A protein has these predicted regions:
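Beta-alpha junction/loop-to-helix N-cap segments that form part of ligand/metal-binding clefts
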Residues: 21, 29-31, 44-51, 59, ...
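Segments of small-molecule ligand-sensing domains
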Residues: 301-311, 322-379
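Extracellular/periplasmic periplasmic-binding protein-like sensory domains
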Residues: 243-315, 376-379
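Solvent-exposed loop/turn segments at secondary-structure junctions
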Residues: 38-41, 78-82, 106-111, 130-135, ...
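Extracytoplasmic "Venus flytrap"
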Residues: 23-52, 76-83, 105-106, 177-185, ...
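Extracytoplasmic ligand/sensor domains, especially the bilobed periplasmic-binding protein
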Residues: 97-205, 254-275
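Immediate post-signal peptide segment of exported/extracytoplasmic ligand-binding proteins
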Residues: 20-34, 65-70, 166-172, 331
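Short, low-complexity disordered leader/linker segments with a strong preference
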Residues: 1-31
């Protein structure tokens, strides 16, 4: 009887705490889920993001949390593999019972997870490292998109900025290297569309498989046209391998790539050979502490990590989620969180703004062009 009584008290306490709010919400905690690569060639991207989010959550919790509740993060490694990302999302929602999702990674993984798991389960995801159109559709066109909130510009925005810059410099022989997945295909479509506006087409197109550095064939295809510029829709390992392969072939085009490459990681991989590579960015310059959101981000990470575009983007994602949870009130539910996010129109995070509405999931159109200078410094 004593055991049964203790069990009953425990069950009543558990029921009381879980009934405090939605799934993943108790009187004292809010559980947030994350799936991203923490291992493999893309592991450094996810590790940087997780470090920043954990640091920011600590800051929020030390200041009293949100309506007395502390934020907890449950982060799973997907290795930038679509099947694993989908499985992790299912685990986070069904087994771990998280309240919401934060900071995913990759176009194909996020699109599949949205359409197969979190969109169907009506669990919001705030932020992913992807500019794919598939996760930016209006909820009117795909009801699963109602639960996807992007905080960065699209690949169409990035590639248009890159192409416009190259064309303004008089370049007419522009080739494309893309990785064979959702990211690569979205970027390729963006380049083709942007060139079409200038009555141009890519002079050559070549591909590399995701998570691969086997770029010799692609470099040979592109080198044949002696391009003035190459837009590389690839991550840092493949990008570095391609640049080196092209230089071995005595090719010296203007190399351009998109924000997911990670400037710091590309510099680590290429060393001095990274000099001159242009990169489109979708966040403010993370070393410019005159921008309030950058200053906050730098303060949060302290000496735990070096400033980076990935780190700043993770901070922006986490801040958008925290702001929306605060606006949702103490009686927290997923639907209230969605409503709070949809009400964020021209929401100022401190020099960086995001906008949503019931039918808008783009979040931002901000694009900046940078170039890697001497010593691996990112220059604007």
């Amino acid at each position: 009887m004593r055991f049964l009584g203790a069990l009953l008290v425990g069950l009543l306490g558990w029921v009381g705490s879980t009934l405090a709010g939605e799934v993943g919400v108790t009187d004292k905690t809010i559980l947030i889920g994350m799936t991203a690569p923490f291992s493999g060639s893309s592991g450094p991207y996810g590790q940087d993001m997780r470090t920043v989010i954990q640091a920011y959550f600590r800051q929020v919790n030390e200041a009293g949390g949100i309506n007395g509740r502390k934020l907890e993060l449950r982060a799973l490694d997907d290795g930038y593999e679509t099947d694993k990302a989908v499985a992790n999302t299912r685990t986070l929602i069904s087994a771990d019972r998280v309240f919401a999702l934060l900071a995913s990674y990759g176009s194909s993984p996020t699109t599949a997870a949205m359409n197969e798991v979190f969109g169907v389960a009506k669990v919001p995801l705030v932020g992913t490292i992807s500019g794919a159109d598939s996760i930016r559709q209006s909820p009117k066109d795909n009801r699963n998109n109602r639960y996807m909130f992007n905080v960065r510009a699209s690949y169409a925005n990035e590639t248009e900025a890159i192409v416009n810059q190259l064309v303004s410099l008089g370049f007419k022989n522009i080739a494309v290297l893309y990785q064979n997945d959702g990211f690569g295909n979205s970027g390729l479509d963006g380049v083709v569309s942007a060139l079409k506006k200038h009555n141009q087409t890519p002079s050559a197109i070549a591909t590399v498989e995701r998570n691969s550095t086997d770029v010799a064939k692609a470099a040979a295809i592109i080198a044949k046209v002696n391009p003035q510029a190459v837009v590389m829709v690839t991550l840092y390992k493949a990008t570095a391998a391609f640049v080196q392969e092209m230089r071995k072939a005595k090719q010296a085009p203007q190399f351009m790539t998109l924000s997911p490459v990670g400037a710091d990681l590309l510099v680590q991989e290429l060393g001095d050979e990274a000099r001159g590579v242009g990169i489109s960015q979708v966040m403010p310059y993370p070393w410019n502490d005159t921008v309030p959101v950058v200053r906050e981000y730098q303060s949060v990470i302290g000496k735990q990590a070096k400033p980076s575009y990935y780190g700043l983007e993770a901070y922006v994602m986490a801040k958008v989620l925290v702001d929306a949870i605060r606006k949702s009130g103490k009686d927290l539910t997923r639907e209230k969180l969605v409503a709070s996010l949809e009400a964020m129109q021209n929401h100022d995070l401190g020099g960086y703004r995001v906008s949503f509405s019931p039918n808008e999931r783009l979040g931002s159109r901000y694009v900046d062009l940078t170039v890697i200078g001497s010593g691996g410094r990112v220059l604007r």
